[in-house]
Amino acid sequence: MPLLPPYGGLTRMPNRLAGETSPYLLQHKDNPVDWYAWGPEALERARETDRPILLSIGYSACHWCHVMERESFEDSETAAYMNEHFVPIKVDREERPDVDSIYMEAVQGMTGHGGWPLTAFLDPDGVPFYGGTYFPPDPRHGMPSFRMVMEAVVQSWTTKRDRIRASADRIKHQLGAVGRIEAVDEELIPDLLDQATSTLGSIADMERGGFGSAPKFPPASALELLLARGMTDPVEVTLDAMAFGGIYDQIGGGFARYSVDDVWLVPHFEKMLYDNALLARTYLHGWQTLGHERYRRVCEETLVWALREMRGPEGGFHSALDADSEGEEGRFYLWTPAQIREALEGVGSPGVADDVIAYYGAKEEGNFEGRNILHVPGGAEAAPPAELDDARRAMYTYRSRRVWPGKDDKRLCSWNALMVGALAEAGAALPCRDYLDAAVAGAEFIWRDLRDENGRLLRTYKDSRAHLAAYLEDYAYVVEALLALYEATFDVRWFDAARETADLMIELFADDERGGFFTTAHDHEELVVRRKDLDDHPIPSGNSAAAFGLLRLAALTGEHEYERRAVGVFRLLQRAAVRHPQALAHLLCGMDFYFASVKEVALVAPAGGDGLGDLASVVRSGFRPHVVLAGGPEGTDRPELLRDRGTVDGEPAAYVCQNFACQRPVTEPEALAASLNQ
């Protein structure tokens, strides 16, 4: 008897998600669920049918998102119930952070916790009234089943509509509070920055690294603040703990998203572009400050990982690698001692495999489900085997023959900007031409392929299609990245592009009444509320990045309006930053820059020549968080910092200005270094 195809003998056509660009949404295109993407069509369908909306939010590298899909969304009975009683909507949180942030805040307020997959129930106007995260197919560990939750919602929707309306109204009012935060009518207070930094240092885990208890996320912005403020001890502990832990891919480079435990051993294995861009930059700054070559190595291995495994043909970077392969979390990255020996057969001298096994703490019984997450138990004190580099290359080749984790190959504007900035800084500091070339290619991709016909940024790109209006973080990160690229290359087109982007950001997102910036543009589709992106976790908020970028522009141009807009952000949040320094660490970095006596360095070459390399390397080679840099031939008028400056006796000259006064120009790198180090 022939086997019947699924769904009662009929071959099911893909659902509405088949036309989307998000790899996460495309993963659900063959579900029997009648999914809608977020948009007016879905909301109108809910109003027409008087059904509640079942909103499911996730992302492609999310392990539990995949689990819930297998258990519930691929189940025909569950799907039939969803289709009959709800209007189901699927959202990729990375493409639509505006939607995700609203409903994540709502669920956290209702349940006290959040995460992905996010499951929320909304009225036809999009107002949430109930929600949670992952729900199992059967009752488990005190959790109701997904079917039980849906049935309870349907019952309440049918018989207790007045209660639902009251709950929705209350939640909507609470959600709007973030956008209504008023700026404190006071001057910025330097002592608050000192207090916040002191608090951050006091909560650092000086034994295991990081802050707080498990799970631990890489705290890049917090470490940047501590480095800028000269508190290097907690930075060193954390950088070592992560670099030698299981959260770092000891064979292929790059960091996983977070550690499940408090010792950085067991990661959640997905690799995100944004984490690795931020951490490459932090390890670069750690090397520049502390001089440890191991930090330079981690920085470079992380960037090489991004260039090797995450770069698209047009110069942009993919978003993430999944945690799972072959249906198991972390399988691609795990090892047994026997596999290590097999990979190293014929490599190096006799006994190298035993040395590598010992160095990486691999045991017969394993440390994760019978296999081993490679780490370095001895940390910085452990002497690596003499042939470790050859061994790692052989193990990488061996591992590459395994089934790879899935790749989310959409290119997000903001995350690409983070990687462009990291490559630009590293390329200038190390120095490395390959990194600079990659940074330029990445910036050209953004400027060419992620803007519309009016010059406005677009959020996402895949398969030669860019779409969705960009958000505040996209504009703010692009400003920071292009300024970093200008300082690394002195190519004035990147300064011009940064300024153009900043001006457009102010026009589209600024809150002229209360200060700061909204997450969405003034002409964005109307959602339940219009929020402000404020927290720097796990990535810098749009407001923090906007403030920092505008301050750097103000220093390069002398344009006070940029500084005024940045101060508006600080006035919103300076009191909160004292109480929650880790959550607002990038904001505090911006405040540190504001309160510091910033040194403005202008390098001038003879007209038609260059010759700035030696002077520029003095500035670029060190970690200088309170310096801005401009350079170009005599007669250049952009940035304004270069205007009316000339060479000295025909030789390239460096001008250092601070507190509205400039020192005499110098021509020798040693003299410039002495001036910067005063």
Task: Describe the function of each predicted region.
Residues 286-294, 426-433, 485-489, 553-563:
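Inter-helical turn/loop segments and adjacent helix faces that build the functional surface
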Residues 308-311, 448-476, 481-637:
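Long, polar/charge-rich, low-hydrophobicity segments
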Residues 4-429, 461, 570-678:
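Replace the tail clause
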